[in-house]
């Protein structure tokens, strides 16, 4: 006999890893300068298998004149038969300065820590420019590109049959110049259903880190919706013993606060 339980809680006020899109609801009375997105999900299987996984996301954005401050964190934990088989978190901070209504300059930082990726950490500082290709009530599409510097530390991990880590050995830290790029899309099919998608890439000599997300959201009330999402994380050059791709599928309840001054997340 097999049982399966899937629970999700998602609070949203933006869009994907860095920006936020539009709606008419301020975060507080008279305050339309903030937007927030929080995600909390949990999945468990029992019977022939014994797996559990939890994921957390917090994204925030704040408007200060021509400046937009974007910051957040994400985390994932998974276990199989009582052994840890997934453990990762990231944090980011980005500041955008509006040069025009569509064009902006940005500077930012990002830190990725994924115990099972083959890298103890990947930390980057970056700067570049972004452009709102489409900015309508129904569709918002933003791209950005720039350069930066990254530090990463490869590690050799040995896993057991279940997928838990038996041992890990950190190697020397590496530094490289990276190309930083991202795109974000938010499209409303109607007043109840919309699509959220985003991709970020940090590509350098030592590794190319790609994060891609897509989610379909169905509105239930002004604040609540149901969401089904998929995330892909790809490291092009992991050390021996580590695979290059990880995926996460989520189903959750969405709580949404929006800010029309903020475009979709990057």
Q: Which residue ranges define each predicted feature?
A:
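Solvent-exposed loop/turn segments connecting transmembrane beta-strands
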Residues: 44-52, 80-86, 113-121, 202-211, ...
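Residue-level signature of outer-membrane beta-barrel architecture
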Residues: 44, 60-62, 97, 111, ...
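Outer-membrane beta-barrel transmembrane domain signature
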Residues: 138-225
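Transmembrane beta-strands of outer-membrane beta-barrel pores
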Residues: 42-46, 64-66, 75-79, 111-115, ...
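Outer-membrane beta-barrel "beta-signal"
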Residues: 216-219, 245-266
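Repeated loop/turn-to-beta-strand initiation elements of outer-membrane beta-barrel proteins
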Residues: 34, 66-71, 102-105, 137-141, ...
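Cleavable N-terminal export/targeting peptides
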Residues: 1-33, 257-266
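Transmembrane beta-strands of outer-membrane beta-barrel proteins
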Residues: 36-38, 69-71, 105-107, 125, ...
């Amino acid at each position: 006999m097999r049982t399966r339980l899937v629970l999700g809680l998602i609070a949203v006020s933006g869009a994907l890893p860095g920006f936020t899109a539009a709606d008419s609801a301020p975060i507080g009375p008279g305050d339309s300068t903030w937007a927030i997105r929080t995600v909390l999900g949990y999945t468990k299987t029992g019977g022939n298998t014994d797996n559990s996984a939890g994921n957390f996301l917090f994204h925030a954005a704040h408007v200060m004149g021509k400046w937009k401050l974007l910051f957040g964190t994400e985390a994932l934990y998974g276990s199989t038969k009582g052994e840890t088989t997934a453990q990762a978190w990231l944090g980011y901070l980005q500041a955008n300065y509006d040069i025009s209504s569509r064009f902006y300059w940005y500077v930012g930082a990002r830190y990725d820590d994924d115990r099972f990726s083959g890298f103890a950490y990947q930390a980057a500082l970056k700067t570049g420019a972004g452009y709102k290709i489409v900015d309508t009530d129904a569709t918002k599409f933003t791209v950005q590109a720039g350069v930066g510097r990254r530090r990463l530390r490869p590690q050799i991990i040995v896993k057991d049959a279940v997928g838990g880590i038996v041992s890990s050995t950190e190697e020397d830290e590496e530094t490289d110049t990276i190309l930083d790029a991202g795109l974000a899309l938010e499209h409303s099919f109607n007043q109840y259903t919309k699509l959220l998608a985003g991709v970020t890439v940090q590509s350098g000599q030592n590794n190319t880190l790609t994060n891609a997300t897509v989610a379909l959201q169905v509105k239930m009330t002004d604040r609540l919706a149901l969401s089904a999402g998929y995330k892909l994380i790809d490291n092009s050059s992991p050390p021996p013993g580590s695979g290059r791709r990880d995926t996460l599928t989520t189903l959750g309840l969405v709580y949404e606060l929006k800010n029309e001054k903020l475009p979709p997340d990057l």
